[in-house]
């Protein structure tokens, strides 16, 4: 079976993009809400679903094909978060509510179009990816949204309408997820090439 026919049989595990809970510039919470939906609706086993934080030591990562892109230029994010569905039945798919690519998009297409390659980038822009199991993300992630306030306490971008996400242990641990030191936080940290090799078409 080739990738095209496998993709045509893929069952989407979230609402359509315009029906998802979405707040601009709060990608970490948008993905948390996707994980919550998948857990509640049981469209697939939660162990097939991962939150993927993309960043690096300098917090400068280029991603192409974003809604805020200008033409063919990438957006340089400090970090970005997407959802990975690593299905046991076929190719992996990416759910990115900020892309102009299909929602969802096969990992192979997303990696070619949105990630492209680190080969022609300066090392300061090389991407790393922290891959966290969906269940762990739901249980452990917390954000008081303070990173979205300026020095005067004003919102840089309007926050989500629902309450802040917190755990019994923490009200703010976002930096542990953005950090690409494998000794810190949850999940596994990959280089871009290792991520694509591990989760891409076998």
From Swiss-Prot:
It is found in: Cytoplasm, Cytosol; Nucleus. Its main location: cytoplasm. Keywords: Cytoplasm, Hydrolase, Nucleus. Its EC number is 3.5.1.122. Disulfide bonds: none annotated. GO terms for molecular function: protein-N-terminal asparagine amidohydrolase activity; protein-N-terminal glutamine amidohydrolase activity. InterPro entries: N_Gln_amidohydro_ab_roll_sf (IPR037132), NTAQ1 (IPR039733), Prot_N_Gln_amidohydro_ab_roll (IPR023128). One of its GO terms (cellular component) is cytosol. The active site is at residues 27, 80, 96. It is an enzyme of class 3 (hydrolase). Transmembrane segments: none annotated. Pfam families: Nt_Gln_amidase. GO terms for biological process: protein modification process. It catalyses: N-terminal L-glutaminyl-[protein] + H2O = N-terminal L-glutamyl-[protein] + NH4(+). Belongs to the NTAQ1 family. Mediates the side-chain deamidation of N-terminal glutamine residues to glutamate, an important step in N-end rule pathway of protein degradation. Conversion of the resulting N-terminal glutamine to glutamate renders the protein susceptible to arginylation, polyubiquitination and degradation as specified by the N-end rule. Does not act on substrates with internal or C-terminal glutamine and does not act on non-glutamine residues in any position. Does not deaminate acetylated N-terminal glutamine. Monomer. PANTHER family: PROTEIN N-TERMINAL GLUTAMINE AMIDOHYDROLASE. This is Protein N-terminal glutamine amidohydrolase.
């Amino acid at each position: 079976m080739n990738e095209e026919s496998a993709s045509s049989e893929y069952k989407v595990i979230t609402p359509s993009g315009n029906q998802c809970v979405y707040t601009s510039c709060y990608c970490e919470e948008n993905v948390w809400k996707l994980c919550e939906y998948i857990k509640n609706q049981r469209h697939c086993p939660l162990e097939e679903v991962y939150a993927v934080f993309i960043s690096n030591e300098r917090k400068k990562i280029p991603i192409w094909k974003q809604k805020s892109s200008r033409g063919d230029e990438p957006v340089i994010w400090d970090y970005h978060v997407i959802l990975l569905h690593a299905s046991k039945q076929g190719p992996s798919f990416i759910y990115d509510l900020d892309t102009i690519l299909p929602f969802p998009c096969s990992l192979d297409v997303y990696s070619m179009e949105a990630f492209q390659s680190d080969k022609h980038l300066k090392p300061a822009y090389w991407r790393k990816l922290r891959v966290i199991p969906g269940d762990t993300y739901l249980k452990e992630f917390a954000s008081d949204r303070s990173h979205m306030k300026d020095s005067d306490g004003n919102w840089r971008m309007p926050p989500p309408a629902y309450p802040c996400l917190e755990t019994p242990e923490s009200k703010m641990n976002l930096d542990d997820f953005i950090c690409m030191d494998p000794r810190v936080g949850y999940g596994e940290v990959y280089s871009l090439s290792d991520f694509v090799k591990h989760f891409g078409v076998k």
